[in-house]
Amino acid sequence: MGYNNEFNYVDMHSSAWGLQVASQDPTQRSLRLFNSVLHNSGTQCLLATNAWVEAEGTEFSDAPEGVATFIAGKVRISQCTFANYYLFKAIKGANIVLFNQDEAGQFAPMDCSINNSISYGLGLDINDIASEKNIMGTNIYFHNVLFKSKGSDDTHFFNCVWEGDPKFKVNRDKYIFDYRLNNESHAIAKGDRSLCPKSARYDRFGNDRFARDGIDLGAYVWVAEPQAKNQ
């Protein structure tokens, strides 16, 4: 793929293999994803190997092998949504799959930071790198991330929302896969403004993350829905 590639406001649907990025030099940025959508892949939406990948305001959604896999490399994620309600196969992979190194140990260990984001759906939030045994001694960190699973903060997880529900506007029966937030979302105002890059101030729909005191987690700013009036 080369270096310094950028996907801005890209909407990639229904791919067989998703987007694949591999690099020999993780000190040079291979890919920046900005306010984009990688959705509905036959395998996984993103596979990055030993690459420097950045993503801001981006949705990774719906794939049977997990929506995003990172093997070693440098990973910087801010204001992203990892969601999986894939319909057509059983979901086998976690939403976020992280491998600190490749199996052969050729690559340097991963340098990963995931901030102000959401991991939610029918599969696991993260693969077993998240276990206390496996994550200790790594440079893998999560700040202000909403997880479906039960857990607690420690030296690699900071200010996270555990057993949360983002209340996506999803209706699988009607094939509606809208990963914006409903009024009751646990992701509302749970972010850290200092972790939101100025470049990510506006989401893909033009909504301002800084318009309210609290920063919402995930790719999309919560927009209040009118309350139904009693008849």
Regions found by a protein language model. Give the residues of each.
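Surface beta-loop-beta hairpin patches that serve as ligand-binding interfaces in beta-rich domains
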Residues: 174-177, 185-231
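Glycine-centered loop/turn positions within well-structured domains
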Residues: 17, 44, 53, 65-66, ...
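Predominantly extracellular beta-rich ligand-binding scaffolds that present long acidic/polar faces
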Residues: 57-180
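Bacterial Sec-dependent N-terminal signal peptides
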Residues: 1-11, 37, 52-57, 69, ...
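Intrinsically disordered, glycine/charged-rich C-terminal tails and inter-domain linkers
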Residues: 2, 6, 32, 76, ...
